[in-house]
Amino acid sequence: MSHEPEYKDWQQIVELIRSSVDNQQHEMLLTMLMTPDERESLTARVNILNELLKGELSQRQISQMLGVGIATITRGSNELKSKSDTDKDKLKTLLEQGAQ
């Protein structure tokens, strides 16, 4: 008998998270899925994207402010460059709403 994982692709994970939000269990789910270091890294990534989208600081300044390496900022910048202006605007709006 062969066993296969139930969750095989990213969309299934997104749907799992969406379902956890609908059931108000997202904090529990994300806390159980991610180690403290992973949660810290995710927080840094959100801040990197937020600062890059604001465009007020250089990559070096963002690196110093967040205590992460320039390469980490560059990866975030490269990911943003691969997205459409529409997607960047949507992300910027989400980040602004989340910070309130």
Curated annotation (Swiss-Prot):
One of its GO terms (biological process) is negative regulation of DNA-templated transcription. Residues 78-93 have a biased composition (Basic and acidic residues). The keyword Nucleotide-binding does not apply. GO terms for molecular function: DNA-binding transcription factor activity; sequence-specific DNA binding. GO terms for cellular component: cytoplasm. Keywords: Cytoplasm, DNA-binding, Repressor, Transcription, Transcription regulation. Belongs to the TrpR family. This protein is an aporepressor. When complexed with L-tryptophan it binds the operator region of the trp operon and prevents the initiation of transcription. It is found in: Cytoplasm. Signal peptide: none annotated. Homodimer. It comes from the Bacteria. Pfam families: Trp_repressor (PF01371). Residues 78-100 are annotated as: Disordered. This is Trp operon repressor homolog. Residues 59-82 bind DNA.
